[in-house]
Amino acid sequence: MMAKWMSVAQVKEKIKESSAEEVTSRYLEVIKKSKINGYLTISDKALEQAKKIDKEGHEGPLAGVPIAIKDNISVVGLPNSCGSKILEGYVPPFNAHVIEKLLSAGAVILGKTNMDEFAMGSSTETSHFGPTANPWDLERVPGGSSGGSAAVVAAGEAPFALGSDTGGSVRCPASFCGVVGLKPTYGAVSRYGVVAYANSLEQVGPLANNVEDIAVLMDVIAGYDRRDSTSIDSKTEYQKALVDDVKGLKIGVPKEFFGEGIHPDVEKAVWDAIHKCESLGATWEEVSMPHIKYALASYYIIAMSEASSNLARFDGTRYGFRAGGENWHAMVSKTRAEGFGTEVKRRILLGTYALSAGYHDKYYLKALKVRTLVKQDFDKALSKVDLLMAPTMPNPAFKIGEKIEDPLTLYLSDINTCPINLAGVPSISVPCGFTDGLPIGLQIMGKPFDEETVLRAAYTFEKNTDYHTKRPPEVA
């Protein structure tokens, strides 16, 4: 009998005992019984991939290990809808760089996961294909925009998954679903083949049930890619960072991340986690990051501005959904009006406004200046300490439908995660407690390309607590 939740090491051991085909088949059976709407597409080639790995005796680091992929990452032969009507039916003819790396390592792609439309959201409610449910409470959101990826990992429907993080889209659902999610340093992982939302902010990131599996996946997908000029070969060896020891580490606690509106149980759980690290030999001190209070506004202006440009390419002319029209202009107008959802249209309009003549300097340029100040806050704080620790999300998962009609309230969900994207530094969310049966995430932030220290601290905390071993009763 195969356990529902297994680490990558356990999956590889199971493959040795049986076969990649049997392991893949077991995951596909679990997915068929799913209650959460985590997958948009199941690969009809998954079993074929697994059989080929068995036959050829593939010796890659992920040989036969199944993985789920967010539906904005291109995979040959699988739809890449980005959770949108406008890309419904689009199947890319090429693989994203991270998919090339995964396939070379022997991974088996189970399917594509649900997401907020074009990664614009924090709840996976803006998907054209309906919301994903949180495995811990099916009436609550899993977070977003990589909600499908986090939810299928939490539900035991994949051992790990890939997401993308533009303003918290890996860490938010990791926190809400009680899994581990890493946003790598900007440039650590190639973005080639990932449908762009906001190029200067987003990174591909892994989600898993433990820190070790995050490191395993990063060792496969990270590195330079000539097709992404922002990518860098940092020479990081992620698995070697997994040392159960935080002695001597200096932790900074930014008071601005514990602002008004934080749930008291979240605040307590995070402070308990910090004190746990202190008991294991780390020290902590409070640090101030005065410009963080402007980060959310800066983030949304920059992200929406970049989105208004990036999404101009979707017009029904070349691929995806096309509406009728008397002429080309009418067709494009109608296609975009019908093909994009409400939230995407809102962000395109606001981004276009921020970039328009007369407002560019007032909004967009000012937001870029604030971004520089936020980056300087991180540089200054991290010059004094090795790490920063804070809540990933100020509150636990909220009810489906609770905030979707109030975009400003929904945007506030990103208040603790978007500053990291503005600064481009690495950040991981690890489970650190519960409130009313809902997971709480601890956010650990580090210096650029110092994922080793971030993973070391996360791994040590995980090894000395048991939060990551808890499983959602809704799907157990």
Swiss-Prot record:
InterPro entries: Amidase, Amidase_CS, Amidase_dom, AS_sf, GatA. The keyword Nucleotide-binding applies. One of its GO terms (molecular function) is glutaminyl-tRNA synthase (glutamine-hydrolyzing) activity. GO terms for cellular component: glutamyl-tRNA(Gln) amidotransferase complex. The active site is at residues 70, 145, 169. Disulfide bonds: none annotated. It comes from the Archaea. The keyword Iron-sulfur does not apply. Its EC number is 6.3.5.7. Keywords: ATP-binding, Ligase, Nucleotide-binding, Protein biosynthesis. GO terms for biological process: translation. It holds the Pfam family Amidase. It catalyses: L-glutamyl-tRNA(Gln) + L-glutamine + ATP + H2O = L-glutaminyl-tRNA(Gln) + L-glutamate + ADP + phosphate + H(+). PANTHER family: GLUTAMYL-TRNA(GLN) AMIDOTRANSFERASE SUBUNIT A, MITOCHONDRIAL, TRANSAMIDASE. Allows the formation of correctly charged Gln-tRNA(Gln) through the transamidation of misacylated Glu-tRNA(Gln) in organisms which lack glutaminyl-tRNA synthetase. The reaction takes place in the presence of glutamine and ATP through an activated gamma-phospho-Glu-tRNA(Gln). Belongs to the amidase family. GatA subfamily. Heterotrimer of A, B and C subunits. This is Glutamyl-tRNA(Gln) amidotransferase subunit A. It comes from Methanosarcina mazei (strain ATCC BAA-159 / DSM 3647 / Goe1 / Go1 / JCM 11833 / OCM 88). The lineage of its organism: Archaea, Methanobacteriati, Methanobacteriota, Stenosarchaea group, Methanomicrobia.
